[in-house]
């Protein structure tokens, strides 16, 4: 879980920008989007195989 403490003399916008940066670096948003809907194991395998094929070529 990302945590950001507002520093002394720091605007809320700057703190929010730092928070968004830490969340994006940790991959939290991508993980939530990936887990939003259930994905059958066969579909997971198919996507993994397609991603590997795409990386190769």
Curated annotation (Swiss-Prot):
GO terms for cellular component: ribonucleoprotein complex; ribosome. Keywords: Ribonucleoprotein, Ribosomal protein. The gene is rpsU. The keyword ATP-binding does not apply. HAMAP family: Ribosomal_bS21. Pfam families: Ribosomal_S21. It comes from the Bacteria. NCBIfam families: S21p. One of its GO terms (molecular function) is structural constituent of ribosome. The keyword Nucleus does not apply. This is Small ribosomal subunit protein bS21. Belongs to the bacterial ribosomal protein bS21 family. One of its GO terms (biological process) is translation. InterPro entries: Ribosomal_bS21, Ribosomal_bS21_CS, Ribosomal_bS21_sf.
């Amino acid at each position: 879980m990302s945590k950001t403490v507002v520093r002394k003399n720091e605007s809320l916008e700057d703190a929010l920008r730092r928070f968004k940066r830490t969340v994006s670096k940790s991959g939290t948003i991508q993980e939530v989007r990936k887990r939003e809907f259930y994905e059958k194991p066969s579909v997971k395998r198919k996507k993994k195989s397609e991603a590997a094929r795409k990386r190769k070529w």
